[in-house]
Structure formats: C-alpha cells, structure tokens
Amino acid sequence: KNDIEVLVELYFTGEESAALAQEAVRFWVYEYHVDGVHLSGFAPAELLASDPLLADTKLLAGSWDGVRVPKTAAAPKLRERRWHLGEYNEGFLIDMRRVLKGDEDQVGRLIYQTRRNPDAYGVINYMAATNGFTMMDMVSCEQKHNEANGENNRDGSDYNYTWNCGVEGTTRKKKIVQMRKKQLRNAFLLLFLSQGTPMFLAGDEFGNSQNGNNNAYCQDNEISWLNWHQLET
C-alpha cells in the first residue's frame, strides 16, 4: 500500500518447536498482513522456506545454505530460484567496511562480495542496519559510544570494522569532513555496483548520525530520531 512494504523481525531462541515458529510467522502474515519476515536467531528455515502458505511472503534470514532447493528440470545443474527468500548478507557489511577502511588482503573478499549472487535465492547487501552504526557513524567513529544506554557502554557490538578518518566523533575540521563525505560516496558505490539487492538504513541518504551509538533500540529521542530537514542541507 502506498508503494511501501512492512516487514517484521522475529527472533527465535531455537527452544521453540518448529510448529510453533511456523504458526507465529503465519500469524503475523495473515492477521497483521505484513509483507515479509526477517528471521533472527534459530528459526526452522527449511520448514518456513517450503511452506506453501508463505510462498508469497518475503522471508529474510542470515543464511539459506542449509535449505534444500529442488533442481530445475530445464537446467539440472541449477537450483530452482525461490524468489521470496532473501539472505541478509552481514558478510557484505563486514568485508566491504574492511575494504573501505583500507585493511590488507581484502581484494579477494571485494571480488567475492561484488560478484556473489546465488541462483537459488536473493542476496540483500548492506553497509548499515538497525543493529549497529549508521553509515555516517561508520566513517566517524572507531569505538561505540553507548553510554546513554545506561549499561556502562557494555552493550552493542565491539566489532564494527570502521575508520573515523582521523578524528573520533563530530568535528568541524574541513579535511576530515571532506574525507568522510568521500568515504560515504565510496560506500554507496560499493553497495550499488555489487550483485544482489542493495539496502540502506533510513537516514543514511542524508548522513544521519546516532552520535556513535550502535545499539540505540532504547533511545526514543534525538539519538534515534531522523531529522528529515537534513535532506535540504
């Protein structure tokens, strides 16, 4: 509706029965009419992938490698493509951030992630997501700054694969600001020229920052809010 889709993220511990997990996904699809489900944790991937009631629902997961996909009759060496399955490719984020910051021995990973496009399911490439740094913070911070979360900066990932371009956090130094803008352009170039489906976090298109907070789920304030007036600057 209105040219947007709504997906819900569901986390499974692996202790639920496969039937319960399947029923939960079906419930969200048929009762709330979500367009897709991002499966986190330990979901029964093969059961959900082969569920005929979910055949028209986008299912995103960290990996579909363990899912058996039938061969095509026309091309026996290829697996039948399941258009509703998408891999949430965190490997792209890690490898391309390391490329962006100039880590050694990354050419092979650059080629792999740029060309990767499995025949059986789609790949969703991204440089930032809801659980981590925004793209602006990716080029502004080398350390997380989650003090405002009230957990003594212990929450959130310590592995962010980022480079601050010479200064940690906000700065007015012209050369640093220019370098960060250049790095953002490089990041978008890597994203859009790679095979698969590009995805970017809302606000990254205008340089939104969470002040280095990479776990802002609990911040219902300026840290997590988007200032759409930045589109005009």
Descriptions of predicted regions:
Residues 7-19, 33-43, 96-99, 166-179, ...:
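The substrate-binding groove and active-site-proximal loops of carbohydrate-active enzymes
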Residues 1-33, 42-53, 57-58:
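Substrate-binding/active-site clefts of carbohydrate-active enzymes
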Residues 201-206, 210:
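Short acidic/histidine-rich active-site segments
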Residues 33, 45-200, 217:
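Conserved alpha/beta catalytic core and glycan-binding cleft of carbohydrate-active enzymes
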Residues 210-233:
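Extended hydrophobic/aromatic segments used for targeting, binding, or gating
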Residues 41, 62, 204:
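Glycine-rich beta-strand-to-loop/alpha-helix junction loops that act as flexible
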Residues 17, 21-28, 180-191, 195, ...:
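Alpha-helical packing segments of well-folded alpha/beta enzyme cores
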